[in-house]
């Protein structure tokens, strides 16, 4: 499976905790991430992660393009619902493209765990 990993700044620690918990599962899949999320994963795990631009610099749109062309099967996008994001239109577009292409997307830890436990 090809999995995209994205986290807002206030959720990066939560995503890293999730990734470390399931590193043995994720290691068998192809991973991509926005830049700072990918760097965090690379620095703290043994996982190989293809990194796109930072979300606000177009990374969300790059991952959206990968979804649209059939190159992503799952998205783990831990969003911070309590902080306004300057690139909110990009985030909305990414979530929309997931819906258009019927791509499972987890926007919180509980949903991410359910996806990993039941599908991966």
UniProtKB/Swiss-Prot annotation:
Pfam families: MGS. One of its GO terms (molecular function) is methylglyoxal synthase activity. Its EC number is 4.2.3.3. Residues 1-120 form the MGS-like domain. GO terms for cellular component: cytosol. This is Methylglyoxal synthase. CDD domains: MGS. The keyword Nucleotide-binding does not apply. It catalyses: dihydroxyacetone phosphate = methylglyoxal + phosphate. Belongs to the methylglyoxal synthase family. Catalyzes the formation of methylglyoxal from dihydroxyacetone phosphate. It comes from the Bacteria. GO terms for biological process: methylglyoxal biosynthetic process. The gene is mgsA. Substrate binds at residues 8, 12, 54-55, 87. Keywords: Lyase.
